[in-house]
UniProtKB/Swiss-Prot annotation:
Gene it is expressed from: prp10
Compositional bias of kind Polar residues: 44-58
A GO molecular-function annotation: mRNA binding
UniProt-recorded name of the protein: U2 snRNP component prp10
Protein's UniProt keywords contain Acyltransferase: no
Localisation per UniProt entry: Nucleus
Disulfide pattern: none
Keyword set, alphabetical order: mRNA processing, mRNA splicing, Nucleus, Repeat, Spliceosome
Similarity section: Belongs to the SF3B1 family.
Domain of life of the organism encoding this protein: Eukaryota
HEAT repeats: 393-429, 431-473, 475-505, 506-540, 541-578, 582-619, 665-702, 745-782, 828-865, 912-949, 954-991, 993-1024, 1025-1061, 1065-1102, 1107-1142, 1143-1179
Region (Disordered) residue spans: 39-58, 122-175, 202-254
GO terms under biological process: mRNA cis splicing, via spliceosome; siRNA-mediated pericentric heterochromatin formation; spliceosomal complex assembly
Main localization (coarse): nucleus
Length: 1205
């Protein structure tokens, strides 16, 4: 131990002795410790100065200080000789720890806390592995490197609209200029590749050496003509020496000119946008705000420094300035502090320290991010709009609306989106797209923001129509990446935008715009362009695009063009599906020659496109593929690797289209190649081989004997292995292929080969076996399974079920499928199965207990069929004892098992008795877990339906109170089960008490609870007859409370919907109530009353209550001019219901009055109802058309229509 440090040593002591130490003793110890610390410091200083060893003094002080704390005569015996580095140090061994105070003193009071193991356990439980994924909301965080190539594309300059009706052309690049630019890029790429190739080969070195030699000679000649001068290193604070140089003609560079009034919008209009353009405007502003370098004046120094206590000193003689004056005159920029001038202060105020959420002219936003400053920074500046030009005002208005859409609240977004849509043509296409498209190219964009901006483009495309033509390519650059997004809804949005764009621009303009990208040097651009062309074909029709596709696929200029053309046809097949059948022959002819193309990529893509066409056309269209069968077969024999995989895939999709004899012939020929490729090390090849085998095996021409002798042995040898089971995709394909083979050769051939795998030590292998057996036996049954195989099967499944350690339910599903398929044949094995279930119900693992309970639910029917009611009663008693389970998932499974046993055994034979079981279920209803709630309510409903007499009415009422809370559950199935259970209970104990409980529930504030209560009341009315409910509802309607009255009306609506024709008996009783509701000031009242009338009238069609319906129609009709969409829809439905009840004639008398009203809104309302009547009752309306007198020119009266047969 070093002499200059305090000896921190761990020692043992008794806690009781420490608790008995008096305060005085503690103070004495503190004083001694302080004295010891001072001695240590003095010793340290002396050892530093004179290197004196004071170890003996230190030990004596330790002995004097610690003597009363140890029972041993030698205190060092109690010391630990080493620091324990274990994680599980006990509390007694860790009594005293060093604190962080200055004195480095010991703690005098024990510190108690939970063990580290327990703390670590809770820490692990709180860890959420998906939290990092959820926090990454930006799109670029989940994109692959291939998808991120979209940031490398540029928004090209605006292109000329060659299809303007007036014949004039707008400013922009023509098609010829675009093609020249594309050719220039190709040539540049070719030169770079050639240079790299020569550099690798070493042929470029000699040219470089010759150039370097000539450069050196030129330098020597220049040096001879100039005055020899020793070079001197330049300093930043010295002016460069003046050297007279010969004026030479210098080429003017565009970088010599400083940008003026540079904005993103103007640059986008002229030259497009690149990745660095986003920050360019900000850099220009910073360049303008950067102050010139100058010396501080006396006034500025007086402001910075205090005036008192300071004196201005004269420079000493010989002082030289560190910054040369000539450098200052040249305006060199140095990072020095400066005092802002008055004209600079407003510019600094424009950049706020914190990001605001309330923007002038926009309002209070939901959020405002740092990235938004790049695009919406102009809105942060408060400017006088009277001094702005019309274009600047339009730009600021568009920015405000876009900011509302992007960052605003839902009402704000809705209003801004409507304004952008309505004023799209007023704003103009250039002003809109030059602000929207750069936003969509932002790297930090999130899914919700992109969705909203894409919605803006979708809306304004309808309004702009052909005005979008100059911006077609820009829109495609932004939208095409959506077509390869992993999100399905993003792909759907992209297809919708491109479809609308194609309809607005026209096919000719779309082809002219996308033609340069077909043979682009970048594969990413070609891929997205092909997908966009497929969307254009689906929008404008495949026949319109076929001539262009035929020319592209036969291009001799570029193999990239042929490759892209074939890919377009592949994407058309994937997008349109069976809709390609009318054009199948032409599409196959377009790409058929590609199977023999000189480029391998074109051949592969052609084969893949043919497979997509065949898959889309299944099971028709074999005639269209006649021309490609021979090239396909020769390619299968000739190619290897990826090319062979593509050709095999195409052949596999075409064979099922053939006639049985041809399919059998081709299958036998291709199966030899497939068997050879079974041993291929390539994973993709194996997947394709499996798919082709399943397709060939499912054809009609292939015999089971051929598959059994030639295919199955090699198939199981190569594919049924542990390595294949560990790969999820291969595992799934192997299972599907095995099931297809089983359907041809029978279940026994497959089960015999895989049954021994149930006892394999690899769990993924056992799981693959279980899934295969489950699907094979589930589809083919066990009629081919003999007794020995049956024994092996049950033994293997039971072993796999006992040995499983994963939470998946594959083996459980297989177990239940096998047991239910065997039926009574598995009776000898039931005691062993039940004993296994009972043993696993007592397992410490919650997952094991849950699966054991689920297995009980699935085999109860077999237990009943085998007559093992004693086993079921035993299981019921055991499960009843486990109703105190703490894990909700396990408890839900136990309740499901009890429900299955109750359904099979019956109420009278159930053990435990129903009178003991139901009271245990009442407190479980309070459990908020969805699985527990659903199974509990279903069980209670079964008991109420079949065994209500075993339980007292008081217990049923207690359950009713608990069920009321279930009416507001989030899951729909739980709410439905609760409502049905109310009907069973009301049927069991009478509707009075249940109805009173439900009517009281109408007074709560929660709307969902009230709606579910109204449905429950309707169920009670349907179960116990309406006359038991209608008087109570009509009496409760008198309650002067809005929620209660609305609830009563809604209950009547549901009730009349349920009871149908029984409503005829209550029409006249309920009419005054409905008349009062239709004349209420509350719109919701009138809406709900109109719904009641709809259901009431539809239930009384042809039952002779037309007078009451006409009375209700007279009160309902004035509401036809309501503006609320919900109210007007309910009113129209009520009118349609009355029309079906009383006929279309009286309704026509009402409708004719407003069909030709001067007001457009009135006409629209009446014509909507007229169109609905015309759709349903066109023939019945003819006699009720208004009579129009003839005039001198026209005869409106047709005599034949007056004839009634």
């Amino acid at each position: 131990m070093s002499t200059g440090t305090y000896p921190y040593k761990m020692f043992k002591m008794d806690v009781t002795n420490l608790n008995k130490v008096e305060d005085v003793e503690i103070e004495r110890l503190r004083a001694e410790r302080e004295l010891l610390r001072r001695q240590k410091e003095a010793a340290k200083n002396s050892s530093t100065n004179g290197s004196v060893n004071i170890e003996g003094t230190q030990d004596s002080n330790d002995l004097q200080y610690n003597a009363h704390l140890f029972k041993s005569s030698n205190p060092k015996e109690e010391y630990d000789s080493a620091i324990d580095v274990r994680n599980d140090i006990s509390q007694d061994e860790d009594d005293y720890k060093r604190t962080n105070d200055v004195n480095d003193s010991y703690r005098l009071v024990r510190q108690y806390e939970a063990p580290k193991e327990l703390l670590n356990e809770y820490a692990d439980e709180s860890y959420d592995p998906m939290q990092e994924r959820q926090s990454k909301k930006q799109i670029q965080d989940r994109e692959s490197d291939y998808q991120k190539q979209r940031y490398d594309r540029q928004l090209t300059p605006t292109r000329v609209d060659a299809f303007q009706p007036d014949g004039t052309q707008s400013n922009g690049r023509s098609y010829a200029e675009v093609m020249r630019q594309v050719e220039l890029e190709k040539e540049e790429r070719r030169v770079h590749m050639e240079l790299n190739q020569r550099r690798r080969e070493g042929t470029l070195k000699e040219v470089e050496e010759e150039e370097s030699i000539s450069d050196k000679k030129r330098e020597l000649e220049l040096n001879n003509t100039e005055i020899s001068q020793k070079p001197k290193r330049s300093r930043w604070d010295q002016a460069p020496p003046s050297v007279t140089q010969v004026s030479t003609t210098k080429r003017r560079s565009r970088w010599d000119k400083a940008p003026e009034n540079f904005t993103i919008s103007e640059h986008v209009i002229e030259n497009g946008i690149s990745e660095d353009l986003i920050n360019k405007e900000v850099n220009v502003v910073e360049e303008k705000l950067r102050p010139p370098v100058r010396l501080l004046t006396e006034e500025e120094l007086n402001e910075l420094l205090p005036s008192e206590g300071y004196a201005i000193l004269e420079p000493p003689p010989g002082y030289l300035e560190s910054i040369h004056p000539e450098l200052l005159q040249k305006g060199t920029t140095l990072d020095t502090y400066h005092v802002p001038q008055e004209q600079e202060l407003p510019l600094e105020k424009e950049l706020p320290a914190a990001l605001p959420t309330e923007i002038p002219g926009v309002g209070d936003l939901a959020f405002f991010k740092q990235e938004d400053v790049k695009y919406f920074g102009k809105l942060l500046k408060v400017e006088d709009e009277a001094k702005l030009t019309i274009a600047e005002l339009r730009e600021r208005k568009i920015l405000r609306l876009l900011l509302k859409v992007k960052n605003g609240t839902p009402p704000m977004r809705k209003s801004a989106l409507r304004q952008l849509t309505d004023q799209a043509r007023d704003f103009g296409a250039a002003a809109l797209f030059n602000q929207i498209l750069p936003l969509l190219m932002e790297r930090t964009l999130e899914d919700q923001e992109r969705h909203l901006l894409v919605k803006v483009i979708d809306r304004i495309l309808y309004k702009l129509d052909d005005l979008v033509r100059p911006f077609t390519h820009k829109i495609l650059v932004v939208i095409e990446p959506l077509l390869i997004d992993e999100d399905y809804y993003a792909r759907a949005e992209g297809r919708e935008i491109i479809s609308n764009l194609a309809k607005a621009s026209g096919l000719a303009h779309m082809i002219a715009t996308m033609r340069p990208d077909i043979d682009h040097v970048d594969e990413y651009v070609r891929n997205t362009t092909a997908r966009a062309f497929s969307v254009v074909a689906s929008a404008l029709g495949v026949p319109a695009l076929l001539p262009f596709l035929k020319a592209v696929c036969r291009s001799k200029k570029s193999w990239q063009a042929r490759h892209t053309g074939v890919r377009i046809i592949q994407q058309i097949a994937l997008l349109l599906g069976c809709s390609i059948l009318p054009h199948l022959k032409n599409l196959v002819d377009c790409i058929g020659h590609g199977l023999e193309d000189e480029q391998q990529k074109v051949r592969i893509m052609t084969a893949l496109s043919l497979s997509a066409l065949a898959e889309a056309a299944t099971p028709y269209g074999i005639e269209a593929f006649d021309s490609v069968l021979k090239p396909l077969w020769s390619g299968v024999q000739r190619h290897r690797g990826k090319s062979l995989a593509a050709f095999l895939k195409a052949t596999g999709f075409i064979i099922p289209l053939m006639e049985p004899e041809y399919a059998s012939h081709f299958t036998r020929r291709i199966m030899k190649i497939l068997l050879r490729e079974f041993n291929s090390p390539d994973e993709e090849m194996k997947k394709i081989v499996l798919k082709v085998v399943s397709q060939c095996a499912s054809t009609d021409g292939v015999t089971p004997e051929y598959l059994r002798t030639d295919v199955l042995p090699e198939f199981f040898h190569c594919f049924w292995s542990r390595r294949m089971a560990s790969d999820r995709r291969s595992y799934k394909q192997v299972v599907e292929t095995t099931v297809v083979l089983a359907q041809q050769v029978g279940s026994r051939q497959i089960v015999e080969r895989v049954v021994n795998n149930f006892k394999d030590e690899s769990e993924p292998y056992r799981k693959m076996t279980a899934e295969t057996v489950d699907k094979v036996i589930g589809s083919l049954g066990v009629s081919e399974i003999d007794e020995r195989l049956e024994e092996l099967l049950l033994d293997g499944v039971l072993f796999a079920f006992q040995e499983q350690s994963v939470e998946e339910k594959v083996i459980l599903t297989c177990f239940s499928t096998v047991v239910n398929a065997l039926g009574t044949r598995c009776k000898p094995y039931l005691p062993q199965i039940v004993s296994t279930i009972l043993y696993r119900l007592n397992n410490k693992s919650a997952n094991v207990r849950e699966q054991a309970a689920d297995l009980v639910s699935s085999i109860t029917i077999v237990l009943k069929a085998c007559g093992e009611e004693a086993l079921m009663r035993k299981l019921g008693v055991v499960l009843y004892e486990y109703l105190g389970e703490e894990y909700p998932e396990v408890l839900g499974s136990i309740l499901g098992a009890i429900k299955a046993i109750v359904s099979v055994v019956g109420m009278s034979s159930m053990q435990p008795p129903i009178r003991d079981l139901l009271p245990r279920l009442t407190p479980i209803l309070r459990n908020r877990h969805e699985k527990v709630q659903e199974n509990t309510i279903d069980l209670v409903g079964k008991i109420a339906d079949r065994g209500s007499e075993y339980v007292s009415a008081r217990e049923w009422m207690r359950i009713c109170f608990e069920l009321i809370d279930m009416l507001k559950a989030h899951k729909k199935s739980i709410r439905r089960a609760a409502v049905n259970t109310f009907g069973y209970i009301s049927k069991a104990i009478g509707p009075q008490d249940v109805l009173a409980t439900l009517l009281n529930n109408l007074k709560v504030q929660e709307r969902q609870n009230r709606v579910c209560t109204t449905v429950a009341i309707a169920i009670v009315a349907e179960t116990c007859m309406p006359f038991t409910v209608v008087p109570a509802l009509m009496a409760d309607y008198r309650t002067p409370e809005m929620n209660v009255q609305n609830g009563v009306l809604k209950s009547l609506a549901f009730m009349f919907e349920y009871i149908g024709e029984q409503a005829r008996d209550y029409v006249y009783a309920i009419t005054p109530l409905l008349a009062d509701a239709l004349m209420d000031r509350d719109a919701v009242h009138r809406q709900t009353a109109a719904s009641v009338i709809k259901h009431l009238s539809l239930g009384c069609v042809g039952l002779g209550v037309e007078d009451a319906m006409i009375h209700l129609l007279n009160i309902l009709w004035p509401n036809i001019l309501e503006e609320s969409p919900h109210v007007i829809n309910a009113v129209r439905e009520g009118i349609d219901g009355i029309r079906n009840c009383i006929g279309v004639g009286p309704i026509m008398a009402y409708l004719v009055q407003g069909l030709f009203h001067p007001s457009r809104k009135v006409r629209n309302t009446y014509w909507t109802s007229y169109n609905s009547a015309y759709v349903q009752s066109a023939d019945a309306m003819v006699p009720y058309y208004p009579h129009v007198d003839d005039d001198q020119f026209n005869n409106y009266d047709m005599k034949t229509l007056h004839i009634c047969i």
